[in-house]
Regions:
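Structured alpha-helical
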Residues: 632-855
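The conserved acidic donor/metal-binding loop of glycosyltransferases
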Residues: 363-367
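Cell-envelope/extracellular polymer assembly enzymes that use nucleotide-activated donors
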Residues: 277-279, 310, 462
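A conserved acidic beta->alpha catalytic loop
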Residues: 315-322, 338-339
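Short, acidic, metal-binding catalytic loop of nucleotide-sugar glycosyltransferases
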Residues: 297-308
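N-terminal membrane-anchoring/stem segments of glycan-assembly enzymes
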Residues: 2-272, 536-543, 666, 671-694, ...
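Membrane-embedded multi-pass helical conduit in multi-pass membrane proteins
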Residues: 177-181, 185-242, 533-619, 634-700
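Long helical/loop segments within the catalytic core of UDP-sugar-dependent glycosyltransferases
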Residues: 256, 334-358, 369-457, 468-469, ...
Length: 855
């Protein structure tokens, strides 16, 4: 006889739903449920204790089955899920890894290789330390003035020798077996170098990566092009051209950052009366007051003598309310009658009306800390040939990638690689690029080149190129001294990148750094790499489509055996991945670079192509900032190209699996290679689609973490010393509890050499903290609050989160998670009949239980 558990289960299944109306009789529910129970009981002995335990945990084990409203299809869902649970959760992964002999052998090999790598790393570290010590002694002997010549001679000599050896290694012919042996040795060397924490080890990784990738490219040019018809030849050459482009960008990138310069602020003279005059330019066009306010107030709070600083709002929108705000805030207001040349024209117009020795430019959403000028102007005073000091662009609101992929706050943002690392490499070669904001410029240098460049839509990069061509120096301070608003939506983000891509290609055509006079060779290479980087649209699309001709039409784009492909392609990819991981560690998470490029590739393809042919076409578009998103949705307009590529790759995957099952043995290995390629493409495309799923913005004004203390005085006079958690323009979140809603308090904060108090009311208690609404009675109150928060000295450089695991395998697993979220969102949001059909089919797929289960 069935137990009470089984009886209760049967009663619940056959019980009519209380939500059914008279027009929907209970039989519509009970008949399918009864039939389902009958079918299940035929195949499964439900009366046994094991299955009674399953029944008791049915909602946990079968999360996609609604046991209150069973239907005929649920029989199949339950059967599929049961098989899945039996095969994939019967033995926990930990037990498999611990008791399986093969797994134990693999683990032992990994430990052995790890010990060898650690030993080599320690030995290499000692050798490199001794080399470094000798170099330091040599520097002391040759003297300070001769150090740069000594370093340059060593660098160029080593570079020439390494280049000759690399050419020899690249062109030396090997058979497949010899290639495997050679690259195994190189791979072991590269892996060992990752254990050595020294700059020279990274340079050696560059050499190995260029050698392996160069050898792959040599093999591609000499052995894999087969004229088996015009279409096959065209597709082969197209892929080879894309790979050549990627190789060139990779080599230039290695050169750019081979010896980054971590420049620190230069101390100003102790006598503040000798400090130079500075004009602060804040250009604006159509931004809201909420966007402009923090920047203007922070400019007012800059640590600089009052008689030597002037703040100007440059309003290209000619709005009366902006002029009124400028008067209330105590800053200057400039507008112009003719609105030509967009932002560049706006700044050039202001230059005619001002006279400061130096000019500082902030986009109207970029908020500086109070020490911005004291940390940057020192270099301009110290070296009269420096025309530009650029600081990193950081952002206090999440960009679409952070927001929509739910990235940890500790993970580097999309721009971090360029602003925090590549710019240091540019500084080594005197090729720092002006980024349009968060920079100080020498007025006389700008006047010498005719002001900000107006010939292209990326006036900032073009201006720095012109300055370098005239012999002026540029520098960057690696310390974050300002932070801004990210683009809130993916469409706005793409619009901004389209302008950047178009502008850089315009410079490439109109003022090519390789052809014009006045630049050193390293400067030419740095600027060239920055420009051709934005040509990645077509190569990226080619890589996403390359395996499909073979799947659809049996057309070879790489004419080679599977063994040769493994011997050449895999080492090329692995070395590039290892080197980039070491190069970008702390500045970009593994595999996210491919996702960034995939999202943008379709959209920058046409603008860059047009700019190559018609460089004078295109106009400046203002990036939208300060918008809000109050509902989760998929931006189908933006996601359509990714969706098309996903469908094509899914079709290719299905055809590939079918061919693998039915093909002759010699073709299987080639099919497996193409299937693996398509599978990786689908991971990248799935993650790219996930970025198009716009998440809700929790707060109308972005909240910013802050490390600071505060004293709260409640209505009864009690004082509480607390910590600040985060803030916005009108809110403050403190680490305290127990206050009544709407209670009036006074909050005291100390920072930047001042103690300020603010009135506030308790808004709510949430997540263990108390949120306060600030009560500002004047503009001066807002300026003082800005001084304690946005403009707080050193604030933008604070680190708030622990380190994020950025190992290679962790990055790949995270990519898989992003892709899974993207495909899940596609199923969830796909509209119309197609969406309903896909969701119905997907409902049969098994899924992991809601909790860890061992059957």
């Amino acid at each position: 006889m069935p137990s009470k558990t089984l009886s209760d289960f049967k009663d619940r299944l056959l019980k009519p739903s209380p939500k059914r109306s008279e027009k929907s009789p209970a039989t519509k529910h009970t008949l399918p449920a009864a039939f389902a129970f009958f079918l299940i009981s035929i195949f499964i002995p439900l009366e046994r204790a094991f299955w009674q335990g399953i029944i008791a945990r049915r909602r946990e084990l079968y999360p996609h089955v609604n046991f209150d409203h069973l239907c005929f299809a649920d029989v199949l869902r339950i059967c599929i899920q049961t098989i899945f649970l039996a095969f994939f959760t019967a033995l926990p992964v930990r037990d498999f890894w611990q008791f399986n002999p093969l797994a134990r052998f693999i683990r032992a090999v990994i430990r052995l290789v790890g010990r060898i790598g650690d030993s080599i790393g320690r030995l290499g570290g000692r050798i490199i330390f001794n080399i470094g010590a000798n170099v330091v002694k040599s520097r002391r002997r040759v003297g300070r003035k001769q150090v740069s010549k000594f370093q340059n001679s060593i660098f160029w000599a080593a570079g020439i020798v390494a280049g000759l050896l690399a050419i020899l290694c690249i062109t030396q012919p090997f058979n497949v077996q010899g290639q495997v042996v050679f690259l195994s040795i190189v791979l072991l060397s590269a892996w060992s170098l990752t254990h050595i924490k020294a700059r020279i080890s990274l340079m050696l990784l560059f050499v190995l990566s260029v050698t392996v990738s160069g050898r792959y490219l040599w093999w591609r040019y000499t052995s894999t092009i087969h004229a088996d018809g015009a279409i096959s030849l065209f597709l082969s050459c197209l892929l080879l051209a894309a790979e050549t482009y990627a190789f060139i960008v990779m080599v230039l990138g290695y050169f750019q950052v081979c010896w980054p310069l971590d420049r620190r602020p230069k101390r100003l003279p102790a006598d503040r009366s000798t400090w130079p005059t500075v004009d602060i330019f804040i250009p604006t066009y159509n931004e809201s007051l909420e966007v402009i306010k923090p920047t203007v107030f922070a400019a007012k709070n800059l640590d600089w003598p009052e008689d030597k600083i002037n703040v100007y709002i440059l309003d290209d929108g000619s709005r009366d309310w902006v002029e009124d705000f400028a008067k209330a805030a105590g800053v200057h207001y400039i507008k112009r009658d003719e609105h030509n040349h967009a932002k560049a024209g706006n700044i050039n117009n202001a230059m005619k009306l001002t006279s400061g020795e130096f000019i500082t430019i902030y986009d109207c959403d970029h908020v500086p800390s109070s020490d911005f000028l004291t940390s940057t102007v020192g270099w301009l005073v110290h070296d009269k040939k420096i025309a530009l000091v650029q600081t990193p662009h950081h952002f206090y609101s999440p960009d679409p990638f952070e927001k929509n992929l739910h990235l940890d706050r500790a993970m580097p943002f999309e721009n971090s690689l360029f602003h925090d690392y590549i710019q240091k490499g540019n500084d080594t070669w005197n090729a720092v690029m002006f980024c349009g904001s968060n920079a100080v410029m020498r007025r006389s240098a700008l006047e010498e080149i005719g002001g900000i460049a107006v010939e292209t839509v990326t006036e900032d990069a073009h201006t720095s190129l012109k300055l370098n061509r005239r012999g002026w120096k540029s520098a960057c301070i690696s310390k974050p001294l300002a932070s801004g608003l990210s683009t809130e939506s993916l469409s706005a983000h793409i619009g901004q990148r389209i302008r950047w891509a178009r502008g850089m290609i315009q410079i490439f055509r109109l003022d090519n750094p390789l052809l014009k006079k006045g630049l050193t060779l390293p400067q030419r290479l740095c600027f060239m790499n920055a420009m051709i980087h934005f040509l990645h649209g077509l190569p990226r699309i080619i890589f996403l489509l390359a395996p499909l001709p073979y799947m659809f039409f049996d057309i070879y784009v790489i004419y080679a055996t599977a063994a040769a492909i493994f011997a050449y392609v895999i080492p090329h990819m692995v070395h590039a991945a290892i080197t980039n991981q070491q190069l970008q560690r702390g500045y970009r998470y593994p595999f996210l670079g491919g996702v960034y490029e995939t999202v943008l590739s379709w959209y920058i393809l046409l603008p860059t192509t047009v700019a190559l042919i018609f460089p004078h076409k295109g106009k400046f578009n203002v990036t939208a900032k300060g918008m809000t998103i109050d509902k989760k949705y998929v931006d189908w307009h933006i996601a359509t190209p990714v969706l098309i590529l996903m469908v094509l790759n899914l079709l290719g995957l299905a055809i590939g699996i079918y061919k693998t099952v039915t093909a002759a043995d010699p073709q299987v290995s080639t099919l497996i290679i193409n299937i693996a390629w398509i599978a990786y493409n689908l991971l990248v495309l799935g993650a790219a689609f996930a970025v198009a799923v716009e998440e809700i913005m929790e707060h109308p004004l972005p909240r910013v973490p802050l490390k600071a203390g505060a004293v709260v005085t409640t209505s009864d006079g009690t004082k509480h010393a607390v910590s600040v958690v985060e803030f916005s323009q009108t809110e403050l979140v403190l680490d305290m509890k127990g206050l009544a809603a709407d209670e009036s308090v006074v909050i005291e904060m100390t920072g930047n050499g001042h103690t300020d108090t603010f009135k506030a009311t308790v808004a709510r208690e949430a997540k263990g903290f108390t949120e306060f609404d600030l009560v500002f009675e004047s503009v001066e109150d807002e300026i003082r609050f800005n001084r304690q928060t946005f403009a707080r000295e050193g604030h933008w450089g604070d680190k708030f989160d622990s380190h994020v695991d950025d190992r290679f395998i962790t990055g790949f697993l995270r990519l898989v998670g992003f892709a899974a979220y993207g495909f899940k969102s596609l199923v969830e949001f796909l509209p119309g009949t197609a969406g309903r059909f896909v969701r119905y089919v997907v409902s049969f797929l098994p899924r992991m239980p809601k909790a860890s289960v061992g059957l």
